């Protein structure tokens, strides 16, 4: 009356399920850098340059090789934060810099810019900072490593 089912799952199904779990657990971000704890508090009253769209500030002594914070849209609290380490250089020696604004006083250890491009000082790769750190020219083919941003109450906090 009852039929015994010896192999209810085809042999191909188990490897497919394992592959599905392996692929679905991968991250979209390029985490190529060694872990460095990041917790950067930025008061916008001090860094009011970050209240203007496309403006950026490089904090040279934060993160692995510095942290670049970019204002995308201050009305909606939209900001990006990236590590300044170039993803192309395998020895982590390339630093993505921003073009400084001449004659603009800045805080110690910071560079202010109104340009939305970051350029590696070693390989020359260029990155679009307002489109998520996308490489647009040069040998780099990975995005800059992003950090988490929370903003509000007149400040920005960058964490990992």
Language-model segments: which ranges?
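Bacterial Sec-dependent N-terminal signal peptides
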Residues: 1-45
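Short Cys/His-rich metal-coordination motifs, predominantly Zn2+-binding knuckles/fingers
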Residues: 89, 122-125
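Cysteine-rich micro-motifs
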Residues: 115-123
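Short metal-binding segments enriched for Cys and/or His
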Residues: 126-136
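Short, highly charge-biased, low-complexity peptide segments
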Residues: 137-142
